[in-house]
């Protein structure tokens, strides 16, 4: 079924890791962890495991950047199989919200990326019709999508000789989301020319031409979308829905009755509570939606009524991509130390935003059920999971029936030496080290604790003739990748930032990582963070890490010990096999953003920082402090360190205000 294509054979630790993981899956182990260091070829190991077990696979990545990277790699490994890409289709997303203190209602505002819509529809079709499928997804795969049973039922089967006329087919297509148009560059549409109807599905590049002779199908062809030439003659074809959410007329009728019933119950509650404004608001908004549903079959914000369309009870989980797979699919959670906390956090972030919408009469309580899965629901919907990380979290390690280590790098590259130097004179010492790196034609990364420090240090380095840029949270994902491309090309010698882990991109030109104030206790200098930062130089033969600190914290001690353990294993392997370490040489490819027009949207993982700060006015200072602390630790657990640092700074300010108030 799966055919893995590669000029390389598994080597180093890869063969034993592949054997153990395959054996674990075949023996029915529910949870396993692949603990693989940076540069050890974890993706190649995953590809080999998938090829060996021959089962559909879902690979979940913590962000779109890494998902797009993995998608490219799996496409290369499996050119003859279906490799699909499933991420949030929003280029920009402002969720619906209400801020009571300002009486401010914010309408949902979104910019949808048509390329990603096509890739999502291609995913749904592939997963429902084939078994040789690998889907690379972001955590948005646990958000609601259409009912897979409707997707199966509402397809249109056509065959040559079938009795059907062109207008009957047009009517059928309209019912599954296709629109009539003359613009053939659009997907999810059809056009009619005489006795010929051309269909342009969302899930494939090719179009389908259906030619009629009276009320009979005379010919079916696969055609080139742009020059409309015939690619292949077909005897029959199946047309799948053009959109994720499709429904039958019977389901629509039942949904409208169910919405009316819920509205009656909710209005009675609001009347009993004496909430006159909320009563009138909800009544007017919902009746308007019902009228649109009855006349058009659609209304803005229709997703908030999804429970009624699906026939779900209150609190029941929505349908997601997971429901489209066969029961035996395998899940790989990449960078699990980041992805698992994200999967845990998404439900609460979504519910807290909707609370005001429901309480103040903007939405019915059923809006709560248009949501991502809880972590417990996610675990119930999947079977076997392989967690993949260089630094697995406590959850992964506690539930895994086996932890498979992949320490050895095929390139022979050794984990960098870690030096601890005093903070006194640290900037001058750092400059000397950067100059040495620059003379070798290599690059450096410097991680600091605050955005202000990053800015000042970067400016200081520039004044001294060292080409420097700093990464900060105001840069969007594309701009951040552009900064790192400049570093790789040599346009920049050093990049300074608070969070240099966010991209997870390969930077083989980097031979020096400097960690300023390494002995500061906190999430920015935890054991996991330090090991991840150290790994940034593990792709260069001259890799070195300098920690500037006046004492050795427990986190530093554990990170250094683990790095030294990995160094020893690799050095022994190199000596035994006569391997001379060599730096990874990686071409500057077309970036995934340019290829897929992928943009990160900060709102994908729950409330944005701005939304959190805006809640200050509707909470007491004590409640606001509790919220800030909770969100700060959540951001830190997801390695969103710039967000965590912004929340920390706000927390300090509010605590200072609270202290002054109590001191009066």
Curated annotation (Swiss-Prot):
The keyword Coiled coil does not apply. It is found in: Cytoplasm. The keyword Hydrolase applies. CDD domains: DEXHc_UvrB (cd17916), SF2_C_UvrB (cd18790). It comes from the Bacteria. InterPro entries: Helicase/UvrB_N, Helicase_ATP-bd, Helicase_C-like, P-loop_NTPase, UVR_dom, UVR_dom_sf, UvrB, UvrB_inter. Forms a heterotetramer with UvrA during the search for lesions. Interacts with UvrC in an incision complex. The beta-hairpin motif is involved in DNA binding. HAMAP family: UvrB. This is UvrABC system protein B. It comes from Thermotoga neapolitana (strain ATCC 49049 / DSM 4359 / NBRC 107923 / NS-E).
